Amino acid sequence: MFRFIKDSILELKKVTWPKYNEVVGNGKQVFWLVLFVSIFLGIVDYLMFLVVTYVF
C-alpha cells in the first residue's frame, strides 16, 4: 500500500498541470456550452410538448 502511495506521488510530480488562465478559459467554454445545450434542449422539449398536445 505504501509503495502505491509513493509511486502515485512520484507520478503526480511528473504531470504538467495547466496554468490558471487555461483552467479559467476552459471553465468558461464549458459553462457557455452547457448553457447553450440546455437552452436548445429546453426549446426542443417545449416544441415537442406543443406538437404532442396538438396531436392528442
Swiss-Prot record:
InterPro entries: SecE_bac (IPR005807), SecE_sf (IPR038379), Translocase_SecE/Sec61-g (IPR001901)
GO molecular function: protein transmembrane transporter activity
Membrane topology: Single-pass membrane protein
GO biological process: intracellular protein transmembrane transport; protein secretion; protein targeting; protein transport by the Sec complex
Pfam families in UniProt: SecE
Cell location: Cell inner membrane
Gene Ontology terms: cellular component: plasma membrane
Main location, first listed in the record: membrane
Coiled-coil segments on the chain, per record: none
Keywords tagged on the record: Cell inner membrane, Cell membrane, Membrane, Protein transport, Translocation, Transmembrane, Transmembrane helix, Transport
Database matches in Gene3D superfamilies: Preprotein translocase secy subunit
Transmembrane regions listed in the UniProt entry: 30-50
Subunit details: Component of the Sec protein translocase complex. Heterotrimer consisting of SecY, SecE and SecG subunits. The heterotrimers can form oligomers, although 1 heterotrimer is thought to be able to translocate proteins. Interacts with the ribosome. Interacts with SecDF, and other proteins may be involved. Interacts with SecA.
HAMAP family registered for this protein in UniProt: SecE (MF_00422)
Function: Essential subunit of the Sec protein translocation channel SecYEG. Clamps together the 2 halves of SecY. May contact the channel plug during translocation.
Assigned protein family: Belongs to the SecE/SEC61-gamma family.
Protein name per the record: Protein translocase subunit SecE
Species of provenance: Borreliella burgdorferi (strain ATCC 35210 / DSM 4680 / CIP 102532 / B31)
